[in-house]
Amino acid sequence: MKAANASSAEAYRVLSRAFRFDNEDQKLWWHSTAPMFAKMLETANYTTPCQYQYLITYKECVIPSLGCYPTNSAPRWLSILTRYGTPFELSLNCSNSIVRYTFEPINQHTGTDKDPFNTHAIWESLQHLLPLEKSIDLEWFRHFKHDLTLNSEESAFLAHNDRLVGGTIRTQNKLALDLKDGRFALKTYIYPALKAVVTGKTIHELVFGSVRRLAVREPRILPPLNMLEEYIRSRGSKSTASPRLVSCDLTSPAKSRIKIYLLEQMVSLEAMEDLWTLGGRRRDASTLEGLSLVRELWDLIQLSPGLKSYPAPYLPLGVIPDERLPLMANFTLHQNDPVPEPQVYFTTFGMNDMAVADALTTFFERRGWSEMARTYETTLKSYYPHADHDKLNYLHAYISFSYRDRTPYLSVYLQSFETGDWAVANLSESKVKCQDAACQPTSLPPDLSKTGVYYSGLH
């Protein structure tokens, strides 16, 4: 039987025949990512009109904001979104079969004197998306953007004092779209690492200070904020967990949710249990039911335990990862609940992808998600049909898990670059000259020609 191939997805094939692109970079982005995107929508049983709508929106409103097409031979902006510095990632909520994607907007000024740390490109992307979704509200976005990202003067100062930045995360903001019922919900993710450098404040001080200022207008978020901060402080100065970023829904303040993300360097079941229960502060029946499923996932996935940290440099495209990364968790500050709601992340990047897929399939079967269990591995293979699947270890970046209203929610975050027939289509041999973005790198990739280490699908 012929193996499934994402490039055979009908919506991708039809639109590829119809589309014209403004430049070669946008064409390459489409053929690199759209096969997987189209296949994911198709397998998740989106209606045909919705498949076309979401793919057209992606082509018209998002691809122009992805910058030059990444290669190892040309400088580019390196995004924190993936270990390869690529600015786009698809994910799937397996519980509800909801497709999502995240991207870091990049434009022609990114990395130049006009915007050395990519502070402003996000506004251009928002202008493209605002007319398409009436529910978008930027009030909370403006608040966090002002408090947690660089202004023009701060950007100029750091650009002239680059030694202060060093290996600090340079990504400051990302956008994400949840695709449902022909519409999309827009979210933002804000990284205040550069703001911490220029202000001399810690990320903890910046994030919690900003949310507290917002609580003056929205006091209902104060109780869960206080509980979360008390938990973090109770772990002491030698804690292996620390705030990393904040996110919120770009909808009306009455409906929006704030999430504070913690990086947990200690990879262990005990550390994950501590995050899940907020050090024992959450002990209700629903929390304990969810905890049993966290333990089940831990046993199935088999993360490598120990103290982990993010390696400083990004991985050059094509290099097989040989690393294990820290855990992550976020805590939602609901306006009608004094207790923060946890979501934990199993960092599976660098693990054998077929073993991860087998673990997930078992979990799906136990939950009664029979269709997801039946199709998950086959669909995963279709995204990279020409790869040696038994050797892949870069597809699953994260697996997230939360539990609310006695219902489990699990999502997978997947490598979304050079998918489908890319490896055999010779598109990667095109001579790419970045036309729309300066794409200045945080560092230039090393010469890979001497390593001899590549994997099918990335070049």
From Swiss-Prot:
The enzyme class is transferase
The annotated consequence of gene deletion is: Impairs the production of ergot alkaloids including festuclavine, fumigaclavine A, fumigaclavine B and fumigaclavine C.
> Does the entry annotate any disulfide bonds, and if so which pairs?
none
InterPro entries per record: Aro_prenylTrfase, Aro_prenylTrfase_DMATS, DMATS-type_fun, Trp_dimethylallylTrfase
GO biological process: one example: fumigaclavine C biosynthetic process
Q: What is the catalytic activity of this protein? A: L-tryptophan + dimethylallyl diphosphate = 4-(3-methylbut-2-enyl)-L-tryptophan + diphosphate
Induction note: The expression of the ergot alkaloid synthesis cluster which leads to the synthesis of fumigaclavines is positively regulated by the brlA and stuA transcription factors.
Could you say which residues bind L-tryptophan here? 80-81, 89, 191, 244
Its uses in biotechnology?
Ergot alkaloids are known for their toxic effects on humans who consume contaminated grains or livestock that graze on grasses harboring ergot alkaloid-producing fungi. Due to their strong affinity for monoamine neurotransmitter receptors they may also have clinical uses such as treatment of migraines, Parkinson's disease and cerebrovascular insufficiency.
Protein family: Belongs to the tryptophan dimethylallyltransferase family.
Report the protein name in the record. Answer: Tryptophan dimethylallyltransferase
**Which organism encodes this protein?**
Aspergillus fumigatus (strain ATCC MYA-4609 / CBS 101355 / FGSC A1100 / Af293)
Organism classification, top ranks? Answer: Eukaryota, Fungi, Dikarya, Ascomycota, Pezizomycotina
The gene name reads dmaW
